[in-house]
Design a protein with these regions (language model features):
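N-terminal loops that bind phosphate or other acidic moieties
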Residues: 1-118
């Protein structure tokens, strides 16, 4: 089981999907899950979708990246119910998730990744 994974939470399914595509170009092998939008396909953040993204992660420690405040709130609520350690990052979504993913793919440690993106 991998030690560290990446979770992306966006208000837009298109942003989440596009960011995963971008990341997979530089980090094809890392544990990566993403969610965006609401059940009806609209914009927003869903507790249930975030919970699925976290629960489907094979890693037990997760670097979580989000776009707007309610996405962070949903990450915080999911963290309360999860056995996984979720490290919510307050960095720009695309740049932060991309850099962290590339570093993780290259074998950087959690400490090294956090020092580079913060």
């Amino acid at each position: 089981m991998p030690e560290l994974g990446i979770v992306i939470v966006s208000h837009s399914a298109d942003i989440a999907k596009g960011l995963v595509s971008l990341i997979r170009e530089v980090a094809p092998d890392i544990p990566l899950t993403a969610t965006g939008g609401l059940e009806d396909g609209g914009l927003g953040s869903s507790f249930d979708h975030v919970q699925v993204a976290v629960d489907s992660q094979p890693a037990n420690r997760l670097l979580a990246f989000y776009d707007l405040g309610s996405a962070r709130m949903n990450l915080e609520m999911v963290e309360e119910f999860s056995d996984k350690k979720i490290l919510i990052q307050q960095v720009p979504l695309i740049e932060g998730a991309y850099a962290a993913s590339a570093l993780l793919q290259a074998g950087a440690s959690e400490v090294e990744i956090l020092s580079q993106i913060n």
